[in-house]
């Protein structure tokens, strides 16, 4: 029996994710590290810089499955491929490193992150903070924190856990305002369809509840028309037969945001995600996201136009 070839980026986190997928599949596995454009140049670009080389290898038949961090996968996939499986989701939320609680971070502290979503949420909760761009993989960001380039950094809990470094985290950020990126904490397995590899992944790797949440979250982002770096967060949680969804869209300076939630049948995750997006659009998310694009910030100062779930103002830290 020939080995099933799992393509992955070569970072420590990506390899850990690939090994976790391999452990779920019966039979011989070969993990194939592939260098992506994002590994070579971390300058801001679209999500395909992290996935394009993997997709090309998949389409060419050089690998059987591509293993991704789901939050890095673009909305449009290579023709003839699909996300066919997702193992059980890890913690989807963000954590502080360097402080236990957001309200314990000193006034004016330097907080490091590279995500516009996190920047928008941090400044919405704490406009006094100095949010600095901090790039690199998890290890690099932790080294930069230790070197004093920031007082506190924000990372995904899942990434730290997969590297056995969750003990370095402080508190988890309040998911009411700090809605995570779509797919955060999920490992996405992409395959050519139809294929025996896809069938194997579905049978042994896929966690149905996680896949339903991922489908709903990705559908919401597509329906919002959000670019790959837009300050948008979408989360879904399966509760019995219902999907509990929450969405965030904001300006990078934290001055304006839309926050909404939606509950729908889990029978059609894509429809649930699209409906959350429609609710957010009606509340002004489209205008917020248009102005969040570089060069589109409109005139005026800090204007608030906020939609709070159930009418309650969100807090800043768990």
Place the predicted regions along the sequence by residue:
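N-terminal glycine-rich phosphate/adenylate-binding segment common to multiple enzyme folds
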Residues: 46-94
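Glycine/Thr-rich phosphate-binding loops of Rossmann-like dinucleotide-binding domains
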Residues: 76, 121, 163
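A conserved helix-loop-strand patch within extracytoplasmic ligand-binding domains
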Residues: 70-71, 79-129
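Structured loop/turn residues at beta-strand edges in well-structured enzyme cores
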Residues: 61, 107, 148
């Amino acid at each position: 029996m020939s080995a099933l070839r799992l393509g992955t980026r070569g970072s420590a986190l990506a390899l850990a994710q690939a090994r976790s997928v391999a452990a779920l599949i019966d039979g011989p596995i070969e993990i194939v590290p592939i260098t992506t454009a994002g590994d070579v140049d971390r300058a801001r670009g679209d999500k395909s810089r992290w996935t394009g080389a993997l997709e090309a290898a998949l389409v060419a038949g050089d690998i059987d499955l591509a293993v991704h961090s789901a939050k890095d996968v673009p909305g449009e996939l290579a023709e003839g491929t699909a996300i066919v499986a997702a193992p059980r989701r890890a913690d989807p939320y963000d954590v502080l490193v360097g402080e236990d609680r957001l309200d314990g971070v000193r006034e004016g502290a330097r907080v490091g992150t590279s995500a516009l979503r996190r920047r928008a949420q941090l400044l919405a909760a704490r406009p006094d903070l100095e949010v600095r761009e901090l790039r690199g993989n998890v290890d690099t960001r932790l080294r930069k924190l230790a070197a004093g380039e920031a007082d506190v950094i924000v990372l995904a809990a899942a990434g730290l856990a997969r590297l056995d470094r969750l003990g370095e985290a402080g508190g988890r950020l309040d998911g009411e305002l700090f809605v995570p990126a779509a797919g955060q904490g999920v490992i996405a397995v992409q395959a050519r369809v139809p294929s025996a590899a896809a069938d194997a992944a579905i049978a042994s790797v896929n966690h149905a509840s996680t896949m339903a949440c991922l489908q709903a979250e990705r559908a919401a982002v597509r329906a919002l028309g959000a670019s790959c770096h837009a300050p948008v967060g979408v989360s879904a949680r399966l509760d019995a037969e219902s999907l509990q969804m929450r969405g965030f869209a904001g300006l990078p300076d934290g001055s304006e945001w839309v926050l909404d939630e939606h509950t729908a049948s889990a029978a059609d995750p894509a429809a649930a995600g699209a409906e959350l997006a429609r609710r957010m659009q009606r509340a002004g998310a489209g205008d917020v996201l248009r102005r969040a694009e570089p060069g589109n910030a409109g005139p005026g100062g800090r204007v608030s136009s906020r939609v709070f779930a159930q009418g309650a103002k969100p807090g800043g830290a768990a």
